[in-house]
From Swiss-Prot:
The keyword Signal applies. Belongs to the aerolysin family. Keywords: Signal. Residues 1-32 form the signal peptide. One of its GO terms (biological process) is cytolysis in another organism. GO terms for cellular component: extracellular region. Residues 26-74 are annotated as: Disordered. It comes from the Bacteria. Residues 33-60 have a biased composition (Basic and acidic residues). This is Uncharacterized leukocidin-like protein 2. It comes from Staphylococcus aureus (strain MRSA252).
Length: 351
């Protein structure tokens, strides 16, 4: 009888252990699925925050700061989002009242987000039917519209920058003096400073050589792109390539490396921070500025299936831009949007 009880107890324990093991396996599987889902739903938090703030646009409420004894700064912020291009412009206008200077002074900080619009597409009518469109270049353009009394005197960033993070500070001192330095910080109580800071890993910032006192342009261009253990240059047709034996026309993503391994500017997008210092003759009451944000896309084309085909790379093949015209009232220190529109199939081209 005792032996039967022992057998029964042992059998019961075995069942319990099997049930616990199965439950543990199921829990681990559920946990992994949850982690994978969280990973898949990851989107650049900075961009989402920018979009939520679009409803707060046209913040034309004065916010003066002191510069020395008599200088004042009045701040305005205007945000415009374009659904068609998935681009957000967020501009900060800082009006500087300097009683020791004979001109109006304005600092314009261009922020917002240019979403990557990363796409995998199937094109059955082509041999290389699996396509990947990715953002190879981001562009920000700033122009003074037909007004000789308003001039651009300085900008940040300048020249070419290849570091993963860009940090710079512009300082304005009473009397119309200005300077810029690397890093973030304020200089003294007699000056006003404005900083920029943004990430551009695997990309380079290039200030256009055509910049002048009416026009500035910045390009943020892909260089050597790192994804997982791979590093390939933008000019390499095998960029993001994956063995295509298991891929099909119906699943173009299988012809490329997993998108969750791509650099942030490829996977999510770019959050610009560019600065322009502007002076205006006090006899001029209003000035219009045209601001353009552009996304250029390269197209990578792979042939799905077991029959190998040479990849195809087409650079700056597609692009989208969002243009906004802002009018500045120098006397009242206000800003309003007077025009805005967007274009498809309009990649930026130099010249």
């Amino acid at each position: 009888m005792k032996n039967k009880k022992r057998v029964f107890i042992a059998s019961s324990l075995s069942c319990v252990l099997l049930l616990l093991s199965a439950a543990n396996t199921e829990a681990n599987s559920a946990n992994k699925d949850s982690q994978d889902q969280t990973k898949k739903e990851h989107v650049d938090k900075a961009q989402q925050k920018e979009k939520r703030n679009v409803n707060d646009k046209d913040k034309n409420t004065p916010g003066p700061d002191d510069i020395g004894k008599n200088g004042k700064v009045t701040k305005r912020t205007v945000s415009e989002y374009d659904k068609e291009t998935n681009i957000l412009q967020n501009l900060q206008f800082d009006f500087i009242d300097d009683p020791t200077y004979d001109k109006n002074v304005l600092l314009v900080k261009k922020q917002g987000s240019i979403h990557s619009n990363l796409k995998f597409e199937s094109h059955r009518n082509e041999t290389n039917a699996s396509w990947l469109k990715y953002p190879s270049e981001y562009h920000v353009d700033f122009q003074v519209q037909r007004n000789p009394k308003t001039e651009i005197l300085d900008q940040l960033p300048k020249n070419k920058i290849s570091t993963a993070k860009v940090d710079s500070t512009f300082s304005y001192s009473l009397g119309g003096k200005f300077d810029s330095t690397k890093g973030i910080g304020r200089t003294s109580s007699n000056s006003y400073s404005k900083s920029i800071s943004y990430n551009q890993q695997n990309y380079d910032t290039i200030a256009s050589g055509k910049n002048n006192n009416r026009h500035v342009h910045w390009s943020v261009v892909a260089n050597d792109l790192k994804y997982g253990n791979e590093i390939k240059n933008r000019n390499d047709e095998f960029l993001f390539y994956r063995n295509t034996r298991l891929s099909t026309v119906e699943n173009p993503e299988l012809s490329f490396a997993s998108k969750y391994r791509y650099p942030a500017l490829v996977r999510s997008g770019f959050n610009p921070e560019f600065l322009t210092y502007i002076s205006n003759e006090k006899s001029n009451e209003k000035t219009r500025f045209e601001v353009t944000y552009t996304r250029n896309q390269d197209i990578l084309k792979n042939k799905p299936g077991i029959h190998y085909g040479q990849p195809i790379l087409e650079q700056n093949k597609d692009g989208q831009r969002f243009i906004v015209v802002y009018e500045v009232d120098w006397k009242n220190k206000t800003v309003k949007v007077v025009e805005k529109y967007s274009d498809q199939n309009k990649p930026y081209k130099e010249g």
